[in-house]
């Protein structure tokens, strides 16, 4: 194989082209590639951090939701307990009021019975005195009437 001037010229031109590319073209391309690599690495790291933050936030939300559910259940339990207490208090008050009303009714009936009984005794005594006056045929004085009535009332 012959090495002629064309081949040497081509070698020199190629060497100059390689040197020119390495000096002026290659560094901006390498910088662009490195910049892009760092951007991609940062984006991946940011995505990973966001994914971790999302998982942490999801766990926090689940914990807060569980705590809120427990708190809501506690509030419902307390409300039900208070409702039952109020119902028991109202029932007790109603029973107490019922007992008072019944006792008052019995007392009123008993007082009315005693009043009617006393009224009846007085009428019976007056009738007895009137009957005795008619039998005796004369009138007994007022003081004697009262004495007789008092004795009859005491006996009844």
Curated annotation (Swiss-Prot):
<keyword id="KW-0406">Ion transport</keyword>
<comment type="function">
    <text>Component of the F(0) channel, it forms part of the peripheral stalk, linking F(1) to F(0).</text>
</comment>
<keyword id="KW-0997">Cell inner membrane</keyword>
<dbReference type="InterPro" id="IPR050059">
    <property type="entry name" value="ATP_synthase_B_chain"/>
</dbReference>
<dbReference type="GO" id="GO:0046933">
    <property type="term" value="F:proton-transporting ATP synthase activity, rotational mechanism"/>
</dbReference>
<comment type="function">
    <text>F(1)F(0) ATP synthase produces ATP from ADP in the presence of a proton or sodium gradient. F-type ATPases consist of two structural domains, F(1) containing the extramembraneous catalytic core and F(0) containing the membrane proton channel, linked together by a central stalk and a peripheral stalk. During catalysis, ATP synthesis in the catalytic domain of F(1) is coupled via a rotary mechanism of the central stalk subunits to proton translocation.</text>
</comment>
<dbReference type="GO" id="GO:0005886">
    <property type="term" value="C:plasma membrane"/>
</dbReference>
<feature type="transmembrane region" description="Helical">
    <location>
        <begin position="11"/>
        <end position="31"/>
    </location>
</feature>
<keyword id="KW-0813">Transport</keyword>
<protein>
    <recommendedName>
        <fullName>ATP synthase subunit b</fullName>
    </recommendedName>
</protein>
<dbReference type="InterPro" id="IPR028987">
    <property type="entry name" value="ATP_synth_B-like_membr_sf"/>
</dbReference>
<dbReference type="Pfam" id="PF00430">
    <property type="entry name" value="ATP-synt_B"/>
</dbReference>
<comment type="similarity">
    <text>Belongs to the ATPase B chain family.</text>
</comment>
<keyword id="KW-0066">ATP synthesis</keyword>
<comment type="subunit">
    <text>F-type ATPases have 2 components, F(1) - the catalytic core - and F(0) - the membrane proton channel. F(1) has five subunits: alpha(3), beta(3), gamma(1), delta(1), epsilon(1). F(0) has three main subunits: a(1), b(2) and c(10-14). The alpha and beta chains form an alternating ring which encloses part of the gamma chain. F(1) is attached to F(0) by a central stalk formed by the gamma and epsilon chains, while a peripheral stalk is formed by the delta and b chains.</text>
</comment>
<keyword id="KW-0375">Hydrogen ion transport</keyword>
<dbReference type="GO" id="GO:0045259">
    <property type="term" value="C:proton-transporting ATP synthase complex"/>
</dbReference>
<keyword id="KW-1003">Cell membrane</keyword>
<keyword id="KW-0812">Transmembrane</keyword>
<keyword id="KW-0472">Membrane</keyword>
<dbReference type="InterPro" id="IPR005864">
    <property type="entry name" value="ATP_synth_F0_bsu_bac"/>
</dbReference>
<dbReference type="InterPro" id="IPR002146">
    <property type="entry name" value="ATP_synth_b/b'su_bac/chlpt"/>
</dbReference>
<keyword id="KW-0138">CF(0)</keyword>
<keyword id="KW-1133">Transmembrane helix</keyword>
<dbReference type="GO" id="GO:0046961">
    <property type="term" value="F:proton-transporting ATPase activity, rotational mechanism"/>
</dbReference>
